[in-house]
Amino acid sequence: MYSRLVIFKVGSGKHSTIEGLVDEFDDLYRAQKGFRHVFIIGDEASGEYGSFSVWESKEDAEAANVVIAPWLQQALTSLLQGPPERWGFEVLEPERNDT
């Protein structure tokens, strides 16, 4: 599995605006191949928010980013205080012994 972390700053006092976009974010993510889960994260005081998403593969995450990144940019264009920061990580899962 693979994960993507995108952090963006919109400034304080925008929590309700971001909260209003969460359902749209969710629908967009769920429509992408290889989607597993997304968390929308944020700190109201600093005005920093982001998404942490999990994908079946790095290729799925990168393909989804081609769709999601422009949508995010457009949805937040009047709010963004600088470009979003993006990272990708391999997901490391512990081996489980179910016995």
Name each model feature, range by range.
Residues M1-Y49, E56-P70, T77-T99:
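Short S/T/G/P-rich N-terminal loop/turn motif that feeds into the first structured element of a domain
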